């Protein structure tokens, strides 16, 4: 019926992935967004241990906690590998999952010694944005006046719409996304702290928006 359904699982994802493998349930798309850039201080929790037990172990027995994390990363990788063999597309979110899995001795490298799976920057965001020069572009209203930010939103929208009218087909979708983002930013209260914006813009967009602000 084309209804979008989101289900939150409260637990350790490794237990869930292993159960999916056990029950032969195929998954189309997978990733990991744990904070594995900080694996030893709560960025990644081992399976088979409660949250309370794990937090105590971090303080009282950090070496054992590291061992448990590494064991879980091996299990995690094995489950991902099995699901990918059945057709799942897995990508790294840029959170050091591939790196820490390899350090833990998991089966995460191919025959050439490279990671088996791509990062989302390399495989998804690259072809969509970065390969065409799109990247984070920020501006801040030093007045901290919401009305000034509204003016910059209006100017940015006008500039992007003008650019989009002559843009090649390859970037029209990104340009349209940027316009929708700016138009909806105020309504969705995207400001945290200073009156500022962030936008994925290419070189032409950055220059023309900045010039329009100054004019």
Descriptions of predicted regions:
Residues 133-215:
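Terminal or standalone catalytic/regulatory effector modules within metabolic enzymes
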């Amino acid at each position: 019926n084309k209804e979008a359904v989101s289900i939150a699982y409260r637990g350790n994802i490794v237990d869930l992935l292993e159960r999916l493998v056990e029950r032969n349930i195929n998954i189309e798309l997978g990733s990991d967004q744990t904070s594995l850039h900080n694996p030893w201080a709560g960025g990644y929790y081992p399976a088979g241990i409660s949250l309370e037990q794990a937090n105590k172990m971090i303080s009282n027995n950090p070496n054992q906690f590291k061992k448990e994390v590494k064991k879980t990363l091996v299990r995690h990788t094995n489950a991902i590998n099995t699901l990918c063999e059945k057709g799942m597309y897995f990508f790294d979110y840029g959170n050091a999952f591939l790196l820490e899995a390899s350090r833990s001795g998991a089966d995460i490298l191919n025959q050439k010694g490279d990671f088996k799976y791509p990062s989302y920057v390399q495989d998804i965001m690259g072809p969509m944005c970065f390969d065409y020069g799109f990247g984070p572009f920020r501006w801040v209203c030093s007045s901290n006046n919401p009305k000034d930010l509204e003016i910059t939103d209006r100017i940015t929208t006008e500039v992007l719409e003008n650019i989009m009218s002559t843009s090649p087909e390859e970037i029209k979708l990104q340009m349209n996304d940027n316009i929708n983002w700016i138009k909806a930013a105020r309504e969705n209260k995207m400001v945290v702290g200073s009156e500022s914006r962030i936008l994925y813009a290419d070189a032409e967009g950055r220059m023309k928006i900045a010039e329009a602000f100054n004019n």
